[in-house]
């Protein structure tokens, strides 16, 4: 008997989000225009689901990134995120290396979870997704694992669950420690967002909101039909 047969249907990650593999993303940039402004830092964390159906952070990657040729650099953005693009200790890599590394990690996780496609999870996700997709287009990296426009926005989800849309406030509501001094580091924000997303998904499960009773009954009918064949 395989692992997937031993673990209940709804406790498998591939069945939790309709075949999507969720990946937490955070970026730090030199502006708001994904086509023109530099992508300066990128972090990502994949997720795994235990045999009881609870979500947990898994693998991570983190890159400081060199501005692409001709990129706009907004001084106000650098002041906000505290990034010194001229600091040699950043260890910055090219966009090509960063996007290649990201996609490789995500594709491995997606395959291991037997998911069909990956989906970006981020706080105010449209911003992060736009920069990842723009960098992928600029670099020409093939086999982009992410859905081109679908996303899970933790700001919206936290607004629904806690009435809070700011990351630090949402984390506080979920009793997740948040150090404001480390905020606007892509890796730290990704770690907090991953914990927040996992908390919301797991809390919904604990409250009895998943699996939804209708979907559970439908799955039972499907299983009965498959057994009868």
UniProtKB/Swiss-Prot annotation:
Mg(2+) 2 binds at residues 26, 28, 184, 189. Keywords: Exonuclease, Hydrolase, Magnesium, Metal-binding, Nuclease, tRNA processing. GO terms for biological process: DNA replication proofreading; tRNA processing. Its cofactor is Mg(2+). The record marks 32, 80, 127, 149 as: Important for substrate binding and specificity. NCBIfam families: RNaseT. Belongs to the RNase T family. This is Ribonuclease T. It comes from Haemophilus influenzae (strain PittGG). The lineage of its organism: Bacteria, Pseudomonadati, Pseudomonadota, Gammaproteobacteria, Pasteurellales. The gene is rnt.
């Amino acid at each position: 008997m395989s692992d997937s047969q031993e673990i209940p249907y709804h406790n498998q990650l591939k069945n939790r989000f309709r075949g999507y593999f969720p990946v937490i993303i955070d970026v730090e940039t030199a502006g708001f225009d994904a086509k023109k402004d530099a992508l300066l830092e990128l972090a990502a964390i994949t997720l795994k689901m235990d045999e009881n159906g609870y979500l947990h952070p898994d693998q991570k990657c983190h890159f400081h990134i060199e501005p692409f040729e001709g990129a706009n650099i907004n001084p106000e953005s650098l002041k906000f995120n505290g990034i010194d693009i001229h600091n040699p200790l950043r260890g910055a890599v090219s966009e090509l290396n960063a996007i290649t590394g990201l996609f490789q990690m995500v594709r491995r996780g997606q395959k291991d979870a037997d998911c069909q496609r990956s989906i970006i999870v981020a706080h105010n996700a449209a911003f992060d997704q736009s920069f990842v997709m723009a960098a992928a287009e600029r670099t020409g990296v093939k086999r982009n694992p992410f859905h081109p426009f679908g996303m899970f926005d933790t700001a919206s989800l936290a607004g629904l669950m806690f009435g809070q849309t700011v990351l630090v406030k949402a984390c506080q509501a979920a009793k997740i420690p948040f150090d404001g001094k480390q905020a606007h580091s892509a890796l730290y924000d990704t770690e907090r967002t991953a914990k927040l997303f996992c908390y919301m998904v797991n809390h919904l499960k604990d409250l009895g909101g998943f699996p939804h009773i209708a979907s559970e009954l439908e799955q039972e009918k499907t299983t009965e039909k498959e057994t009868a064949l």
